[in-house]
Amino acid sequence: MSSEAVAQATAATTSPEHGVPTSSATPTPPPSKGGGAGGGGGGEQQQVPFQMIPPGHFFANPFLNPYIPTAGAPAQEGEAQPQMVFSPAQYQEVMHHYFQQMMAASGAQFPIPFPMQFQPALQQPRPSSQASSSHRSEDDNGRQTAGSVVSSNVSPNHREVRPAEDSTETSGVVQNNDELLVPTSTSSDVTIGDVIEKSDSPENSQESAGGEEKSEEKRKLSGDRTDSLIRKQMSEMEKEITRRSQNKNIKTIDDDGLAELIGGSSTRTVADDFSPFVDKSGLSYTAPAPPSTEKSAPKESLNQLRSSFNLPDDSTTVGPVGPSTVPQQSQQFANNSMFMANAGNFVQNAFPIGVTMTPQATFGAAPGFQMMQPHQHNLFMQQPNPTFVNNGTNPFLQTQATLPNFVQNGTAPLVPTVSAQQFTPEQLAAAFAQQQIAQSAAPTPFDSPPPSMPSTSSGPSGALAPPPPPSHPIPRRVSGNGWPEENKENGTSTSTTNGAQSVPAAAGTDDPVWVLRDSYLKKMQREQRTSEEEEMSWQEAATAAQEAAENGGGDDQEEQETDRLLNGGTTGASTKGAERRGSVDKKKNSKETMVHEPAVLIEGVLFRARYLGSTQMLCESRGSKAARMAQAQEAVARVKAPEGDVQPSTEIDLFISTEKIMVLNTDLQRISDTDVRQDILMDHALRTISYIADIGDLVVLMARRMSTSHSDESCSDGDSSGGGVRKTPKVICHVFESDEASFIAQSIGQAFQVAYVEFLRANGIDDPSYLRQIDYQEVLNSQELLGDELEMFAKKETQKEVVVPKKAGEPLGIVVVESGWGSMLPTVVLAHMNPVGPAAHSNKLNIGDQIININGISLVGLPLSAAQTQIKNMKTATAVRMTVVSTPPVVEVRIRRPDTKYQLGFSVQNGVICSLLRGGIAERGGIRVGHRIIEINGTSVVAVAHDRIVNMLATAVGEIHMKTMPTSMFRLLTGQEQPQYI
């Protein structure tokens, strides 16, 4: 290759705003290749691709390009253009001084020498046919003139250009040539190198001539550059910076010219069609455009060009080489130079917004071009993650930990199979040919499918290129439905060739990688936590049950539980039982919810219990609740083992439904493959159950003994079939032990209610709302007030006149509070008396007395503040006359609640009644707002927690006895408040 064949023509300058060429060049076919070997004498100085040592943070000059002469403003035809042309070595020297001066002006030191030092990876001599490796200039003092280093730091699309050298001089001078200057070869294909768009204008010829003269003069100088040359070049660079910043070289172009630029012949260069990467910093990748059915590509607008990375419609697209081109590519690889292209992790948006780099010819744009070979990539990438430029200026680029090595619009698979060692050119060519043959089966280093577009196909004009592969490989799945958006999200896409949809390339090449989904892992973790919580809850329940068995209450506690059960139905369950149920609330609550569903009770529910024993007793036909409770206690005393003895018991399942109650053996018997049964130990019809009681953890079930003389299982309390002497009815009492004793009793009561409703429906009454309305009205009518408070206020006998003597100006020495909303007569109540005051000395008043009037002024219905004002006004009197009704300070309330389905109608907070439902059960029973609950069913709740009080009220049924008093009075009597006497 002669030195005249290595010249570079001017390329179109790109506007930073539009990213489109501002000067057009007539596309011409590539020149015919002639000549055989490369430049004379250059083969002995060749070396194989080198390895770069990462220099750290390096800031490339974004304003100048070492190989493209900078053109001035558009001028008339025939006039010479101001230009500045120099060789790569000269450019490096100028940039070295430029950066030193720039860093010195800012008060810093330039951290690294310029140009960057490179370490040769291999020192193997190469034949003269491969004549594009690094050279050394005679006058560069041993520095490499690797222009591709600067070029690769300027733009990801900038390819390395190594000019062929003569035996006596470095051909860095641009010759006056009207043709596209490319490395020549004996092959008919274009050799590996940068294709520079030619220019036929005389201005470029004059620029080339001027550049040659400058270069020849420069080579004659010594190694030390004069200050005048540096000042001149710095002045030119400052002018270039000013011109670029002001955008004076923008040239308007119409649609026809734009179509001519992007629709040229297939052999023209495509450097103009790639706008700088700076303009793409804020754009997101989208799915490829659908294939066009028409052959002619439509004209594109500036907006489409601004957001497009693709090659023109009829340009040659880089892609994998087919099998038919493998020998040709192997020969071409052996006969042409190898060079680096876009190696290393390169930050795409490395330059400030608004600064435009001069685009270079796209690598691989010529027919038959191949991307960087795998062994070259491996040698160049020995240093892990070499990053050329840090993204410190672009605010639109997201921070990435590691960025991939990529070439847009498809690259050949890069397989790192060749290690860094000495290779001959023949070995490298053979390895390249073998890699090309195994290309289709070789996995890519990114675990992403290789491009499926062949090198001869053409994609639709204006289609967007796919996004670069991720830095960390992630398993992707391809949408089975072929939705483009889903494929875009998954990082996979399907390419089109001549309008036909192609199958993703990674479908059958790689083995599938199975990864557990996050949802499945979370599900396993939830199940594990649930099992651990259940195990802990059962352990806590077992511990609580054991402690309760060891610390069980005596006869007094059993009597309290018995009274509570008698008065409140299934209030049943002691406070210890409620605490034990707290650890297994989930299971208990589920069963409690089940018993409220009629359909569940019709089918039946199961409770696990321990059967302690049974006994038989005589009973009256219509015995009272107290008598039945006494019988239940007697049955427990008969069956339960004495203290200290081992209690014999058997695990059983208690089945409860609306028809019967059965005691089942827990051992399952398999009758067949589909029939598994339990032995029935006892079976009682629901109508034979006469009484159910829960005493702590014990459940007593009383069932009437059926007469053997009656086939209809009627009760034996009637006459016998012979009409003889009446027999005393007998009941059999079964004693069970269970932690769910209260729920068992409640379920049996619910079963009776559901059975009754079903009986009414069977007889034509099928309106549940009607039944509920009648039922609730009956419950309201059953409420009654204890003590006949209304009669106490109505009768004169219960009222008394009290005269309290005192001194003038002396207060009475009393504290009054409200009687509470819900009381029969809203007035004030005497809550406290000063022990040394006139009221206490009179011995006529008691705490709890309700004051009707004072000195003839009625206090009924007055607010508390108004009543207190009236009492204070009596301070000047020497005697005070009052009408009072003597009532105890504690109000007794009795509520009848047949079942838990009827709400009580009041709310409680920390034992204080906060609100009351008008017309409800509680109001009918005498509950008052503002009162403190003192006792529930004989159990003091003064020092009981709020949750326990609520549980006691929520589960209480039957007759509920409560004692309350005004909260203020309670706090005064207990010393929680200081009295303010009036």
Swiss-Prot record:
Its main location: Golgi. Expressed in vulval epithelial cells and neurons. Residues 33-44 have a biased composition (Gly residues). It is found in: Golgi apparatus, Golgi stack membrane; Golgi apparatus, trans-Golgi network membrane; Cytoplasm; Synapse. Changing residue 201 to A: Loss of cdk-5-mediated regulation of synaptic localization. Changing residue 27 to A: Abnormal endosomal localization upon hypoxia treatment. Residues 211-228, 577-593 have a biased composition (Basic and acidic residues). It is a peripheral membrane protein. PROSITE patterns: PDZ, PID. Phosphorylated on multiple Ser and Thr residues by cdk-5 which regulates its localization. Keywords: Cytoplasm, Developmental protein, Golgi apparatus, Hydroxylation, Membrane, Neurogenesis, Phosphoprotein, Repeat, Synapse, Transport. Residues 1-55, 119-228, 269-327, 432-511, 525-593 are annotated as: Disordered. GO terms for cellular component: cytoplasm; dendrite; dendritic spine; Golgi apparatus; Golgi cisterna membrane; Golgi trans cisterna; neuron projection; neuronal cell body. Residues 1-16, 143-156, 169-190, 301-318, 490-501 have a biased composition (Polar residues). Residues 801-886, 892-968 form the PDZ domain. One of its GO terms (biological process) is response to mechanical stimulus. Residues 119-134, 432-445, 454-464, 539-550 have a biased composition (Low complexity). Changing residue 425 to A: Abnormal endosomal localization upon hypoxia treatment. It holds the Pfam family PID. Changing residue 448 to A: Loss of cdk-5-mediated regulation of synaptic localization. One of its GO terms (molecular function) is small GTPase binding. CDD domains: PDZ1_APBA1_3-like, PDZ2_APBA1_3-like, PTB_X11. PDZ protein interaction domains may not be essential for function in vulval induction. Required specifically for the determination of 3 vulval precursor cell fates P5.p, P6.p and P7.p during late second and early third larval stages; required for basolateral localization of receptor tyrosine kinase let-23. Could have a general but redundant role in development, functioning in diverse cell lineages to control cell fates. Regulates the trafficking of the glr-1 subunit of AMPA-type glutamate receptors (AMPRs) in the ventral nerve cord. This may be partly through interacting with the small GTPase rab-6.2 in its active GTP-bound state. This is Protein lin-10. It comes from Caenorhabditis elegans.
